Amino acid sequence: MSQAVQTNGTQPLSKTWELSLYELQRTPQEAITDGLEIVVSPRSLHSELMCPICLDMLKNTMTTKECLHRFCADCIITALRSGNKECPTCRKKLVSKRSLRPDPNFDALISKIYPSRDEYEAHQERVLARINKHNNQQALSHSIEEGLKIQAMNRLQRGKKQQIENGSGAEDNGDSSHCSNASTHSNQEAGPSNKRTKTSDDSGLELDNNNAAVAIDPVMDGASEIELVFRPHPTLMEKDDSAQTRYIKTSGNATVDHLSKYLAVRLALEELRSKGESNQMNLDTASEKQYTIYIATASGQFTVSICQ
């Protein structure tokens, strides 16, 4: 199949199209002339009537002049204005809106298939609203669950990091204590003794007679936090403002003696605050006061906790 094109020059230009094997073997489809009607579901044509950009039915159809792909007018104009100057389907270059042409015949075909276009769009909006509402609720619940998981992981990581820092700090203190003790007691003999004296500070170190500092692992020493509830004794405590339930959160290293002293100082501070006093002597006197802590073993029975 050839075609000659006459130009302004003296020689005509000839163009020849070579047919492929498929085009050579194919036979034209016979036209239906007996009045037979073929029923096709509109849903089966949805892919042909769909805009590749918004995935909805074509509206104000525009066709590209180069590759003949169809898009909604608003979709393709916005894509050319904000994106690359190319066809969204095949990536063929599109210079500007001049590379597009309206396709009213396709719009007429769509209106023929869907005569009630407004009703179809209203139905689509209702379906989308219902889907968005359901997805938003699911997304909210999923976001809350993920947030709780992330918070729990962060708390665990902070706890591990703090324990590692405490352990490294204890090792540093142990090294310095070892150096100072070695210089001070260099003339003393190291006797085989298993007794250990605990330092006065709360650095978590223990010293034996060999002047070797031993760092206590906070994880192995019960550094996990515990929550305690202190209630006034039903028969020994008077019904005053101090007879209130106290909630204390502390580490597992705390002893009964620590808790008793803490309760004494806390109650003294509350009493001074209520009276408007700020005397340091009263606070020192109150800090020396000890409270007896009982453990409720059964209904109406209490056991005294021994300070350790």
Curated annotation (Swiss-Prot):
There is a cross-link at K249 (Glycyl lysine isopeptide (Lys-Gly) (interchain with G-Cter in SUMO2)). The keyword Methyltransferase does not apply. Pathway: Protein modification; protein ubiquitination. It is found in: Nucleus; Cytoplasm; Chromosome. GO terms for biological process: anterior/posterior axis specification; chromatin organization; chromatin remodeling; epigenetic regulation of gene expression; gastrulation with mouth forming second; gene expression; germ cell development; mitotic cell cycle. Residues 176-191 have a biased composition (Polar residues). GO terms for molecular function: chromatin binding; histone H2AK119 ubiquitin ligase activity; RING-like zinc finger domain binding; ubiquitin protein ligase activity; zinc ion binding. Its EC number is 2.3.2.27. This is E3 ubiquitin-protein ligase RING2. The modification Phosphoserine is found at S41, S143, S168. Residues 157-206 are annotated as: Disordered. E3 ubiquitin-protein ligase that mediates monoubiquitination of 'Lys-119' of histone H2A (H2AK119Ub), thereby playing a central role in histone code and gene regulation. H2AK119Ub gives a specific tag for epigenetic transcriptional repression and participates in X chromosome inactivation of female mammals. May be involved in the initiation of both imprinted and random X inactivation. Its main location: nucleus. The modification N-acetylserine is found at S2. It catalyses: S-ubiquitinyl-[E2 ubiquitin-conjugating enzyme]-L-cysteine + [acceptor protein]-L-lysine = [E2 ubiquitin-conjugating enzyme]-L-cysteine + N(6)-ubiquitinyl-[acceptor protein]-L-lysine. A zinc finger (RING-type) spans 51-91. Component of chromatin-associated Polycomb (PcG) complexes. Component of a number of PRC1-like complexes; these complexes contain either the polycomb group ring finger protein PCGF1, or PCGF2, or PCGF3, or BMI1, or PCGF5, or PCGF6. Distinct PRC1-like complexes are composed of a RING1 subunit (RING1B or RING1A), one of the six PCGF proteins (PCGF1, PCGF2, PCGF3, BMI1, PCGF5 or PCGF6), one PHC protein (PHC1, PHC2 or PHC3) and one of the CBX proteins (CBX2, CBX4, CBX6, CBX7 or CBX8). CDD domains: RING-HC_RING2 (cd16740). There is a cross-link at K112 (Glycyl lysine isopeptide (Lys-Gly) (interchain with G-Cter in ubiquitin)). Residues 93-98 are annotated as: Interaction with nucleosomes via an acidic patch on histone H2A and histone H2B. Keywords: Acetylation, Chromosome, Cytoplasm, Isopeptide bond, Metal-binding, Nucleus, Phosphoprotein, Repressor, Transcription, Transcription regulation, Transferase, Ubl conjugation, Ubl conjugation pathway, Zinc, Zinc-finger. GO terms for cellular component: cytoplasm; euchromatin; heterochromatin; MLL1 complex; nuclear body; nucleus; PcG protein complex; PRC1 complex. The gene is Rnf2. Residues 2-179 are annotated as: Interaction with HIP2. PROSITE patterns: ZF_RING_1, ZF_RING_2. Monoubiquitinated, by auto-ubiquitination. Polyubiquitinated in the presence of UBE2D3 (in vitro). InterPro entries: RAWUL, RING1/RING2, Znf_RING, Znf_RING/FYVE/PHD, Znf_RING_CS.
